[in-house]
Design a protein with these regions (language model features):
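Extracellular/periplasmic carbohydrate-active domains that bind, remodel
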Residues: 3-10, 14, 18-137
């Protein structure tokens, strides 16, 4: 009888420990890595934000679209290749994300959006867009 109780208690403990382990387990995804050019960023902007992409917002929206994918994947590396990128609003960089600028990358801050919302004063925010207080897009 004592042996049977001991086996039952041990089984209950094993189940409890396994349950706690699964309860605190976080989803781990493969981190995303992207290499982008101005034209690739523009295409991503049109794909992700078709209705609000303008000639003024195409680069900021496209970069944010790539960074949103990286946030969902738990981070990664965004390599920005040579070219000029026009930025009207903030680019949000999520946790566990590295942004690499190759030689010849130029960011130009512009104050037009071509839409009914205003351009922001900042170019970079070190937090994910999903956690930003004031969310325009």
């Amino acid at each position: 009888m004592k042996l049977k109780n001991k086996i039952i208690k041990t089984a209950v403990m094993v189940v409890a420990v396994c349950g706690i382990t699964f309860a605190f387990q976080t989803n781990t995804y493969a981190k995303k890595n992207f290499k982008v050019t101005p034209s690739k960023v523009e295409k991503q902007s049109k794909k992700s934000f078709r209705t609000i992409t303008t000639k003024y917002t195409k680069h900021y929206l496209g970069l944010n679209a790539f960074l949103d994918k990286m946030e969902k994947a738990g981070g990664g590396t965004l390599t920005i290749k040579k070219g000029t990128y026009y930025i009207s609003n903030a680019i949000y960089v999520p946790s566990n994300t590295k942004v690499v600028l190759e030689n010849g990358v130029v960011f130009k801050k512009i104050n037009k959006t071509g839409t009914n919302y205003k351009a922001s004063g900042s170019m970079w925010q070190i937090c994910p867009r999903s956690k930003s207080k004031k969310r325009i897009v």
